[in-house]
């Protein structure tokens, strides 16, 4: 029975918990958008200068 009370009490504080969870979700979405933007930029560079990109990568010791 005491576990039920704890669960009910914890469920009553849902509004406070949704704040940080919502903020975390927004941060994940923003980071996802940033990653997508970086990947799009890399794709653009590779489409325009793939040969130059490979040469520069090899010259810098890329494997």
UniProtKB/Swiss-Prot annotation:
Post-translational modification Deamidated glutamine, affected residues: 63
InterPro entries: Ubiquitin-like_Pup (IPR008515)
MF terms in GO: proteasome binding; protein tag activity
GO BP of this protein: modification-dependent protein catabolic process; proteasomal protein catabolic process; protein pupylation
Coiled coil as UniProt keyword: yes
Post-translational modifications reported in the UniProt record: Is modified by deamidation of its C-terminal glutamine to glutamate by the deamidase Dop, a prerequisite to the subsequent pupylation process.
Coiled coil: 25-51
Swiss-Prot/TrEMBL keywords: Coiled coil, Isopeptide bond, Ubl conjugation pathway
Region (ARC ATPase binding): 20-57
A Pfam family reported for this protein in Swiss-Prot or TrEMBL: Pup
Keyword Cell membrane: no
Domain of life (superkingdom): Bacteria
Pathway, per record: Protein degradation; proteasomal Pup-dependent pathway
Residue(s) of cross-link: Isoglutamyl lysine isopeptide (Gln-Lys) (interchain with K-? in acceptor proteins): 63
Basic and acidic residues bias locations: 1-12, 24-33
Residues covered by region (Disordered): 1-35
UniProt family annotation: Belongs to the prokaryotic ubiquitin-like protein family.
Domain description: The N-terminal unstructured half of Pup provides a signal required to initiate unfolding and degradation by the proteasome but is not needed for pupylation, while the C-terminal helical half of Pup interacts with ARC to target proteins to the proteasome.
Its biological purpose: Protein modifier that is covalently attached to lysine residues of substrate proteins, thereby targeting them for proteasomal degradation. The tagging system is termed pupylation.
Record note on quaternary structure: Strongly interacts with the proteasome-associated ATPase ARC through a hydrophobic interface; the interacting region of Pup lies in its C-terminal half. There is one Pup binding site per ARC hexamer ring.
Listed name of the protein: Prokaryotic ubiquitin-like protein Pup 1
Organism, as annotated: Saccharopolyspora erythraea (strain ATCC 11635 / DSM 40517 / JCM 4748 / NBRC 13426 / NCIMB 8594 / NRRL 2338)
Gene assigned in the entry: pup1
């Amino acid at each position: 029975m005491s576990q039920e009370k704890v669960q009910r009490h914890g469920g009553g504080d849902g509004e406070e918990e949704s704040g940080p969870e919502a903020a975390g979700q927004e941060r994940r979405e923003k980071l996802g958008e940033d990653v997508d933007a970086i990947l799009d930029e890399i794709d653009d560079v590779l489409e325009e200068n793939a040969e130059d990109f490979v040469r520069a990568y090899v010259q810098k010791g890329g494997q």
